[in-house]
Regions:
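Gly/Ser/Thr/Pro-enriched helix-cap/hinge segments flanking short amphipathic alpha-helices
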Residues: 1-70, 103
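Beta-propeller blade repeat segments, especially FG-GAP/WD-type strand-to-loop junctions
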Residues: 93-107, 147-168, 207-217
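Hydrophobic beta-strand segments that make up the repeating blades of beta-propeller
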Residues: 83-88, 136-140, 195-199
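Beta-propeller blade termini
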Residues: 67-78, 119-130, 158, 171, ...
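Repeat-based blade/solenoid architectures
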Residues: 42-70, 111-125, 150, 171-183, ...
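Beta-propeller fold detector
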Residues: 34-40, 105-111, 166-170
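Short glycine/acidic-enriched loop and turn motifs that connect beta-strands
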Residues: 90-93, 142-146, 201-205
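A generic tandem-repeat structural signature
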Residues: 114-161, 165
């Protein structure tokens, strides 16, 4: 309904007949070729724990234990197909999916179970040992335990070249901080990728400035 030139200095009462009203739905432009197409990936559902940060820290603006999962992609078995890593949460192990001609298939990595209590808040693939395949960095984070807990351990998994990964223990000291971001970079230009880890927060001590770290490879 359009009212042309309504009189001024008057009260106009407009009554809509709701019995005949229809919502306005604009017609979407039809294209011969869609830009995106849905693909059934058959990935396992992510599961969060029931921890509530506000019970411990009442002054935080949002929960710092629900910032995952983080993922990463790389061709880990040299078949020219991108494979997929999805980080886990407290109580759920991380998952690795190998891409094939029929889609993605879950690859069993037993060492992922060792840190199933960690919230994965950063991850990326890189060639850590310079053997020509893609290894995996996983950042430990969250806010479900005090800073002294080992759930904040950052992890390095070495690739056997066929899609199997083994935890390289002792690669990083426990940072005791909530990992916010991790970036591979060759800061000293020696041909090896080093790692910068930016901390988001001190676990369960919101407001305290956390330390960040630079690891030399």
């Amino acid at each position: 309904t359009t009212i042309q030139k309504p009189a001024i200095n008057q009260l106009h009462k407009i009554v809509y007949d709701l019995s005949t009203a229809k919502p306005h739905v604009p017609n979407a432009e039809k294209t011969e070729t869609a830009l995106f197409q849905e693909i059934a990936l058959q990935l396992n559902k992510h599961s969060e724990d029931d921890h509530v940060d506000f019970y411990v820290e009442r002054n935080i603006p949002f929960m710092l234990s629900k910032l995952g999962p983080k993922g990463a992609t790389a061709d880990i078995n040299k078949d020219e197909l991108e494979d997929l890593f999805i980080g886990g949460a407290n109580g759920q192990a991380s998952q690795l999916y190998i891409q094939g001609s029929n889609g993605f298939k879950l690859q069993q990595i037993p060492d992922f179970e060792k840190y199933k209590f960690t919230d994965v808040t950063a991850s990326f693939f890189f060639d850590a040992d310079q053997d020509g395949d893609q290894d995996l960095f996983v950042g430990g984070g969250g806010n479900t335990a005090p800073a002294a807990s080992d759930i904040y351990q950052n992890q390095l998994y070495l690739n056997d070249g066929k899609g199997g990964f083994t935890l390289k223990s002792g690669s990083f000291l426990i940072s005791h901080t909530n990992c916010g971001i991790a970036i591979p970079l060759d800061y000293d230009k020696d041909g090896k990728l080093d790692i910068f880890i930016g901390s988001r927060s001190e676990p369960q001590q919101y407001g305290i400035a956390p330390k960040s770290f630079l690891y030399h490879n």
